[in-house]
């Protein structure tokens, strides 16, 4: 049940794709509510609809039907330009691949994101970025290019990018998949700390059951719906 305090509410979401001459239901009448300071994990085999669900929650993909409510705002039928604005304002994304630009230093990349999110003051952008990198233990990477960093450092930089602008909701798609188990746990713990200390929420799609100790609620995608475990 979505209430005024819920960070995100998905109600009766449906999504189908063409599969040859037929339509295949990927998401069927799915409901999900995430509250402030709640860290949710979604499990399920490849092709079960987990990433599709995350794309709908992240305003990257339209559902065929149903309602999307984020931050108390019904965003189901708004224009794409408004979706872009709300993504920048309300959401932070972490991907399996860090997707850092190889030709820009980390500090410059993150400050560019801060500018896109509305911070006009260059000194404040630099202060925010340096603060986030310090919180994540990679302050020495500020002036480095991605090819000078380890895999774990690059994923931490990607997490810093997601945290810029203080978004209400963090969406993470297999953020630990390319890391060894210990580094994967560190990444999940960093997301958990951000959620709890800064009154945010997070949804993480994962195959990695070793990180579930850091989440509050676990669901599994089954036949297009979420089953709570």
For each predicted feature, which ranges?
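Conserved ABC transporter NBD signature motif
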Residues: 66-74
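Conserved ABC ATPase signature
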Residues: 145-149, 153
């Amino acid at each position: 049940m979505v209430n005024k305090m819920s960070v995100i509410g998905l109600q009766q979401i449906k999504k189908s794709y063409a599969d040859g001459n037929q339509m295949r239901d990927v998401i069927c009448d799915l409901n999900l509510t995430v509250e402030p300071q709640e860290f949710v994990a979604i499990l399920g085999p490849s092709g079960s609809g987990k990433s599709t669900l995350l794309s709908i929650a992240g305003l990257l993909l339209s559902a065929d039907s149903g309602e999307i409510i984020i931050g108390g705002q019904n965003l189901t039928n708004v224009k794409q330009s408004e979706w872009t604005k709300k993504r920048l304002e309300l959401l932070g994304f972490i991907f399996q691949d860090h997707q850092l630009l190889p030709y820009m230093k980390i500090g410059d990349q993150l400050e560019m994101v801060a500018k896109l999110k509305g911070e006009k003051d260059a000194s404040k952008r630099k202060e925010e970025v340096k603060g986030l990198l310090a919180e994540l233990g990679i302050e020495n990477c500020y002036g480095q290019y991605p090819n000078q960093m380890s895999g774990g450092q690059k994923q931490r930089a990607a997490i810093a990018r997601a945290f810029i602008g203080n978004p209400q909701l963090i969406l993470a798609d297999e953020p630990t998949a390319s890391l060894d188990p210990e580094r994967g746990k560190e990444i999940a713990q960093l997301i958990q700390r951000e959620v709890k200390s800064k009154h945010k929420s997070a949804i993480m799609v994962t195959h990695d059951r070793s990180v579930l100790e850091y989440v509050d609620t676990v669901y599994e995608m089954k036949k297009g719906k979420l089953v709570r475990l």
